[in-house]
């Protein structure tokens, strides 16, 4: 169950009430969100939730508090970390630079050193 209480600035107590209600209704896990640059309110929520519920998985998406380590998150009872858009956001500048270089040089040779070999891509597909 996804809880947006912290994003809506309704506070930790509202988030906790919702989390406990969702678990009572059969939720398999709790995903708690925050836009804050520090994990303080996430940690407060997790510590209070864990004081009453030690088994329901807690999921976080630390996009805004990205300096927080997985070990720090785990220390507060968080079970799953989702890196929601970091791969897409890092891939786009590389694709943009490659496209610009192809346009600049009117060919693809200058981007060869940045390309993954086709054989390696095929190997990845075979593993799936």
Regions found by a protein language model. Give the residues of each.
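Alpha/beta enzyme core
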Residues: 1-83, 89-100
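Extended, intrinsically disordered, low-complexity segments
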Residues: 86-128
